[in-house]
A protein has these predicted regions:
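Short catalytic helix/loop segments, enriched in acidic residues and glycine
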Residues: 19-37
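Hydrophobic faces of well-ordered beta-strands that scaffold small-molecule active sites
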Residues: 2-8, 42-45, 69-73, 92-94, ...
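C-terminal helical cap(s) of enzyme catalytic domains, especially alpha/beta-barrels
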Residues: 103-115, 182, 201-229
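Flexible "arm" and connector segments at domain edges
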Residues: 138, 145-146, 190, 212, ...
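Catalytic domains of carbohydrate-active enzymes, especially glycoside hydrolases
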Residues: 33-45, 87, 153-155, 159
Length: 418
């Protein structure tokens, strides 16, 4: 997995060399996150909090509400970690707090694992020549990472392994040290610091490690799309590619090659490799039933893909919406219909005629009717009415069901379950 990094300082996106010299500053964190999220999780690092020179928590909260973020930087107690989880972070990165002056801070890590779960904890092994550094990489501990791996494994769902002396330098990472860590532990490892070529991306991925990228992306050494392709395992040939729509309904099974993925990322149209014709083909090129690329994920073995698209028309050559049957009616389906009617604004469209005042009145009315409904049929009928008007309200405010469901999922993952 490729994990792009958004490092924050004073509300801006920055890139530092060895955690010190700032060489890049941008003011578009939300736009970057939208772009990065198409490929999976994002690492969001609060540089100011790590150095105890401020914090960027409000901005991080915004990012966590919309995207799958692993959050780190200055998390020094259980309460801070739990707060980020409650705000929507999928994982927490802890570094400084995981160590004392002479070893592992087991009381803290034990309490953290009990509070948020071991699977959500990423322990940062920030090191200079094999020795752990803390406090924004400013403090040397003298602790050899090799000596504490087994002790840390009890509390970690993953390690973030950063070669600090190479961080931001674009001189290549320490592959020997990565190999040593990989030989010592079987839990997931994310490698960061100095990655400077697609060849290196391929080598690290083949070591069964994730890769966190920063400077190489921001300096345009290579693109996120290129690094995603480089991390895949093509040793068995073409990659099976499951294609689904935004609601999660499977549309078709296709196959991808390096070249088809390159073309797809460039055109943002569903593009695949035909095993029968032995060439690259673009979905909808002749029929007009095109697929707009939205996001992509690789599986755990890096040899299969799950791609989400916006489907125009139908996906199957039989004129069925999906190669696996007709379209399923889901909340996203209803919202798509509502948005179309709002955009078209036909004179005879009841949906388009609903102004804010009328819409508010109908929601209040239908909510009351749902409360008063008695039979099963009445409850279903009134719930459907309320759901429809709620969908119109969300659509007018340009809020997707995806964001609503993310909020419900966030609440479900916190300790205060309802």
């Amino acid at each position: 997995m490729i994990i792009p990094s958004i490092d924050l300082s004073n509300g801006k996106v920055v890139q530092l060399q060895q955690g010190k010299n700032k060489v890049i500053e941008r003011d578009d964190p939300l736009q970057l996150a939208e772009q990065f999220s198409r490929f999976g999780e994002i690492a969001v690092i609060d540089i100011d909090a790590a150095k105890q020179q401020g914090e960027n928590r409000d901005l991080i909260k915004q990012l966590c509400r919309r995207y799958d973020c692993r959050v780190g930087g200055g998390i020094r107690n259980v309460e801070q970690a739990e707060a980020f989880i409650q705000q929507g972070a999928v994982k927490i990165i802890v570094g400084t707090a995981a160590f004392t002056g002479v070893g592992v801070n087991e009381p803290f890590l034990s309490a953290l694992a009990k509070r948020i779960g071991k699977n959500r904890i990423i322990i940062a092994l920030d090191h200079i020549k094999g020795k752990v550094v803390t406090d924004g990489w400013q403090q040397e501990t003298g602790i050899e990472f090799r000596q504490v791996i087994k002790q840390l494994e009890k509390y970690a769902g993953e390690f973030l392994f950063t070669c600090v002396e190479k961080e931001g330098m674009l001189q290549g990472t320490d592959l020997e040290a990565v190999g040593q860590l990989r030989s010592l532990s079987d839990i997931p490892v994310t490698v960061a610091g100095g990655v400077n070529s697609l060849e290196e991306v391929t080598r690290i991925s083949a070591m069964n490690c994730h890769i966190q990228l920063g400077m190489a992306l921001y300096q345009n050494i290579f693109s996120l799309e290129e690094s995603f392709i480089a991390s895949l395992d093509f040793n068995k040939g073409l990659l099976p590619t499951i294609v689904q729509d935004a609601s999660g309904q499977v549309l078709m099974l296709a196959y991808s090659s390096r070249e088809s993925l390159q073309k797809m990322f460039k055109s943002e149209r569903g593009t695949y490799y035909s095993r029968s014709r032995k060439n690259i083909w673009v979905k909808g090129e002749t029929s007009g039933n095109i697929q707009q690329f939205r996001k992509i994920r690789m599986d755990c073995d890096r040899d299969a893909l799950l791609m989400t698209v916006s489907q125009k028309g139908v996906a199957c050559h039989t004129e069925s919406y999906s190669c696996f049957g007709d379209r399923q009616f889901r909340p996203e389906t209803l919202q798509q219909i509502v948005k179309q009617r709002l955009q078209t604004a036909a004179p005879d469209s009841y949906t388009a005629s609903l102004n804010q005042t009328a819409l508010a009145g109908k929601i209040m009315e239908e909510a009351q009717e749902l409360i008063e409904a008695e039979t099963e049929a009445e409850v279903i009928w009134e719930a459907a009415d309320l759901f429809y008007f709620m969908t119109v309200l969300l659509s007018r405010k340009n809020i997707s069901f995806e964001l609503v469901f993310r909020e419900l999922d966030r609440r479900n993952k916190t300790k205060d379950k309802r």
